[in-house]
């Protein structure tokens, strides 16, 4: 019998790629539960659509490339992309929005560059930006939390809104949104940005019913849910601490400085940290091992730059939330960051 020796390392952690991906997906569950509680079961419908779509597109591309289908599907990377995209779009977005996003994420961003490990950008965020730029109306159709709705939308009506654009009584998403005390803005970040532009102070804006004491009603708990999941990933050593800590620290520092400089028009540190996609961005998106920086020093720089861009775009840009744009922009800089932060090889110090 011929024996062969595999290449090193021979001692490993027994953490397969599939197990890592499924662990990250499981860590999304607290944030997912918070979204379902505060924004309805539409997010579950989007999640099912996304998982089916990414599986179909991944399998189709593997067949076209004459590669084995099951190994590509079973590694879980496509499923994680679908989960992150489904959690990022409005729960009642039309069904074709998530399908187009999954098509772009898997076929263009991931497989066109060679598949897992070769994509330059985070597939879920690249797809999110494509959808936001191409379909801004559908991608900003966030409903207020269910407690503020005059008539809570049941599962069947949410299903009808996603697939037909209307409830059983003939109401569209826009009509449902406009029925909540005249509120038509999508998220707390939207509301503060618009109100400040119209001359209101932050404290006046936050008197509206969509806000809680610290941040947007519902969004605070969604972010805390993703924070809990992110802390679990850190404890399980699935991700390193450098990127989320530098991301959150940079955003906290910038927002604190902004609040000190202009307390009337800047919402402050806690609001920035617990609104929008801050926590899912810090722990689940920016930490993508393929498109993020690879050295510890580089990860600190990478995360800090993303946090800085999130603050700048939220404050001075045209989009209220900026995590996706910030991650993609710093993805471009990753080769440069890695080049200048490579650790010095022992025995090859600089010549004096």
Q: Can you say where each PLM-predicted feature lies in the sequence?
A:
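Cytosolic-side transmembrane-helix boundaries in multi-pass membrane proteins
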Residues: 1-20, 313-352
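N-terminal signal-anchor module of multipass membrane proteins
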Residues: 1-63, 347-350
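C-terminal ends of transmembrane helices
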Residues: 8, 56-68, 106-117, 227-238, ...
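Structural signature of hydrophobic alpha-helical transmembrane segments
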Residues: 41-53, 92-101, 209-223, 266-278
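Cytoplasmic-side transmembrane-helix entry/capping segments in multi-pass membrane proteins
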Residues: 69-80, 98-101, 118-129, 241-249, ...
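A generic, well-ordered mixed alpha/beta core segment in the N-terminal half of proteins
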Residues: 81-154
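Loop-to-transmembrane alpha-helix initiation sites
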Residues: 120-125, 269-278, 299, 317-330
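Long hydrophobic alpha-helical segments that form multi-pass transmembrane helix bundles
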Residues: 123-224
